[in-house]
Structures are given as structure tokens and as C-alpha cells.
């Protein structure tokens, strides 16, 4: 195994720091505990990078604690994020660019999370392949409790030391791990974990969990991992139970992680295997119901009839949400779901337009402009039911919403495809 001795000098390059900032800026993100935004950092970019470079050269650089941010999970519960300052993100990104090419080529081939050229679609397609072509239809869905928050610092450094012997790099890596967390005005030490939200945390997690990947491979088990989402695909139920036992022992005893046995399941693909937002069945893949509910909640928020925006503005805000949803879930067999969702969305948009017209006379004028002849039925303009009436469809036809207003049509996107397995 090749060892890397002198890497710290690669950090001491202003151009590298500048490229790292460009990456951090593209990723966006909130300010850390110092309150400095990306735009404020950019205003004094040369001075900020010069100061960082000097601190790194003199080895005076010390990361600041991350800012605790709590966000709600779609399925309930909370996710704790740690937001580093902009300057710390720049150093982390530079460090990541140095270390990633050293470790990534050796990762398990079925590891897909946070790796260049790999995606959720590749992971799902690999699971489909194992289930449908290789008859590995008994699947263990491993659930790790607070994986990122419980990574053992000594084991992290030990893993990096296998290839990196530069003490200054390892010291810098540990300083990020031990920088602590600010929860409001209270400081909390960080004796374990690598906070979600850190630029280098995904690489740390992949290096850490690759030990598990390789252990399972050496034992003859087929796995697919995306970050801390793990599937073990087996030929029989007894094989799945054995694989679960092997995995649990290694994860808990060697890697010091906690397997949530209540959420770790063994399932046959005929009943559906939950993975990365989809249910993978023996013959088809569908979107998980919770993901559809979360999507509809977002659409409802944008298309509230109490919105102050006109229909043009609503559609402009809505389109990126529709595009993101269908682009992710197009790997599923979801043509019917997309058609039903578009009918529901158009109904909501018609309800907005009807309410903004306020008076039936405006509706009737619109119908006459489109060539319809009176008399027209007098209807309540604020009624949700009437937004589905024939008059509403005549006045606000599908073609007008899509062709003239530019509403993205999820039902018009090809779905049910698989990407090439890598």
C-alpha cells in the first residue's frame, strides 16, 4: 500500500484555496458562528485567503466550533447539522481535494454516496440488478443510529493513517473533528462524530465505513451502500439472517457504531425493499408513499389560494420543485403517479386563477375570448370544487398552463428507466 508523507505543503497554495472557495460558494450554505456570509467573505476574498494562508503556514490555524442547526426529517424526527464558518469550509474543501484522490479509488465498488460520477440512481439500479438478475431477493436493510454523530475519532485517524503519514495533515483533520459545537450560546465538546454539514464529513464517513464494506466483501456478502444507507442482498432468508448478524457484530464491536435493530429489517423483494426513497419490488420499482406526501406538502405551500403571487409567479416557483421530483424519481415505474399528481396540481392552479378573477364576469369574459358562447353557469369563484368544473377547464385548459404559462409536465417525462450499473 502506497504511503503519502508530505501533503501539508499542498495546502499552502493560494490558488488551491481560491478554487476551494469557488466550490464552497457554489454549494451555498448559511453563515457559521462568526456570522460571516459567503457574500461578505467574497467581498474581501484576497485578504481572507491571505490570512488563511498565513495561519496555515505558521500552523496557527484553528477551526471554530460548528453552529448547530436542527431540521425536521420528512418522516418525523430531527436531523442535527453542524454548519462550519466559511473560512473553515474553504480549508476543509482544500483538504478534501488533497485526500479524496488518495482514498476514493480503493473504495468498495458498491459504495455510491458522495462520490464523483456516482448517484442514488446508480445505487438503486445496482439493487435492481442484484434482485432481478441474480435472484438475491432476500434483503437486509441496515439502520445505523446517528451514524455521523457517533464516528469514533481515534478510529477515523487510524484509518487515514493507513495511507497518510503526514502528521500535520492528521493533526488538522483531528482539529476539525474536535472543534466542538455551539448550541445557541452554549459550547459543547465533540468527543465523537463528524458533523453533517461539514465539507469533509462525507469523505470521513466513506473512509470509516469502507472498512465495513471490505469486511462484508471478504466474507462473500453482496452489499450496496449510499452513505449510511446499507443493503445486504442474499439468496435465502437464512442467509439474510446470517449476514445481518455478521454486519451487526462488525459495525458495533469494531466500528463502535449502533445498529438500530427495531429499524433493521429483512424483507423479500416481493413485498418491496425500501431504499433511497423508493420501494424496489421483484418486477417493478415505485415511489415511497411518504415521499409523495412530502412532495404534495411542498406543492400545497407554493399553491395556496391565499398566495399573493399571480399565476406566473406561482408556476415559476413551482417548476423547480416539479423538475427535481420527477428527475429523481423517474427511475421508478411511476407514470400513473405522475399523471395523477399533474391533475391535482392543475386543479390547484385553476383554483388560484379562479380566486384571482374574483367575479364570475371575469371568467365569462375569458370564455368568450376563447370562443365559447353564452349563456354560462354562474359559479362561486372561491370554491375548490368549482375549480374542477367544466367551465374552469374551458377557461384554464391544460394546453394554456403548459404551452403558454410554461408549467412543467411531469407526466411527459419518460420514467421507469435504469442507469448503467457501475
Task: State what each model feature region is.
Residues 178, 254-323:
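A conserved non-catalytic segment of reverse transcriptases
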Residues 111, 189-193, 300-315, 324-337, ...:
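Short, solvent-exposed helix-loop connector elements
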Residues 12-17, 65-69, 74, 177, ...:
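Core structural elements
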Residues 348, 357-422:
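Extended C-terminal regions of large enzymes
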Residues 1-47:
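N-terminal alpha-helical targeting/anchoring segments
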Residues 264-271, 317-321, 338-346, 361-370:
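A glycine-rich phosphate-binding loop feature that marks nucleotide/adenosyl-phosphate handling sites
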Residues 48, 55-70, 74, 106-272:
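Conserved polymerase palm-domain catalytic core
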Residues 87-91, 138:
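Duplex nucleic acid-engaging cores and interfaces of nucleic-acid transaction enzymes
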Amino acid at each position: 500500500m502506497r504511503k503519502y508523507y508530505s501533503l501539508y505543503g499542498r495546502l499552502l497554495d493560494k490558488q488551491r484555496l481560491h478554487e476551494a472557495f469557488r466550490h464552497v460558494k457554489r454549494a451555498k450554505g448559511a453563515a457559521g458562528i462568526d456570522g460571516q456570509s459567503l457574500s461578505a467573505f467574497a467581498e474581501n476574498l484576497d485578504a481572507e485567503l491571505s490570512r488563511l494562508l498565513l495561519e496555515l503556514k505558521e500552523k496557527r490555524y484553528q477551526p471554530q466550533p460548528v453552529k448547530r442547526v436542527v431540521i425536521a426529517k420528512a418522516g418525523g424526527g430531527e436531523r442535527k447539522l453542524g454548519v462550519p464558518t466559511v473560512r473553515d469550509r474553504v480549508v476543509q474543501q482544500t483538504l478534501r481535494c488533497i485526500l479524496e484522490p488518495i482514498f476514493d479509488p480503493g473504495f468498495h465498488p458498491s459504495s455510491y454516496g458522495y462520490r464523483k460520477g456516482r448517484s442514488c440512481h446508480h445505487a438503486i439500479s445496482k439493487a435492481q440488478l442484484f434482485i432481478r438478475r441474480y435472484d438475491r431477493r432476500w434483503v437486509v436493510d441496515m439502520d445505523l443510529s446517528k451514524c455521523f454523530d457517533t464516528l469514533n475519532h481515534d478510529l477515523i485517524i487510524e484509518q487515514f493513517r493507513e495511507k497518510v503519514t503526514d502528521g500535520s495533515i492528521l493533526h488538522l483533520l483531528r482539529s476539525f473533528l474536535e472543534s466542538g459545537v455551539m448550541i445557541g450560546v452554549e459550547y459543547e465538546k465533540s468527543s465523537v462524530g463528524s458533523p453533517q454539514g461539514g465539507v469533509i464529513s462525507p469523505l470521513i464517513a466513506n473512509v470509516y465505513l469502507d472498512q465495513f464494506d471490505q469486511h462484508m466483501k471478504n466474507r462473500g456478502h453482496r452489499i450496496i451502500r449510499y452513505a449510511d444507507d446499507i443493503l445486504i442482498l442474499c439468496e435465502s432468508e437464512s442467509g439474510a439472517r446470517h449476514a445481518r448478524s455478521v454486519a451487526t457484530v462488525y459495525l458495533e464491536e469494531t466500528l463502535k457504531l449502533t445498529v438500530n435493530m427495531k429499524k433493521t429489517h429483512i424483507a423479500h423483494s416481493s413485498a418491496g425493499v425500501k431504499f433511497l426513497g423508493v420501494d424496489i419490488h421483484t418486477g417493478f420499482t415505485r415511489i415511497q408513499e411518504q415521499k409523495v406526501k412530502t412532495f404534495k406538502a411542498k406543492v400545497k405551500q407554493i399553491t395556496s389560494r391565499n398566495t399573493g403571487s399571480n399565476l406566473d409567479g406561482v408556476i415559476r416557483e413551482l417548476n423547480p420543485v416539479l423538475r427535481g421530483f420527477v428527475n429523481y424519481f423517474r427511475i421508478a415505474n411511476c407514470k400513473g403517479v405522475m399523471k395523477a399528481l399533474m391533475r391535482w396540481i392543475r386543479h390547484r392552479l385553476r383554483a388560484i386563477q379562479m380566486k384571482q378573477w374574483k367575479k364570475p364576469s371575469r371568467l365569462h369574459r375569458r370564455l368568450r375570448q376563447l370562443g365559447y358562447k353564452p349563456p354560462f353557469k354562474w359559479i362561486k369563484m372561491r370554491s375548490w370544487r368549482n375549480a374542477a368544473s367544466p367551465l374552469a377547464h374551458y377557461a384554464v385548459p391544460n394546453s394554456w398552463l403548459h404551452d403558454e404559462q410554461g408549467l412543467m409536465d411531469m407526466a411527459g417525462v419518460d420514467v421507469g428507466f435504469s442507469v448503467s450499473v457501475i
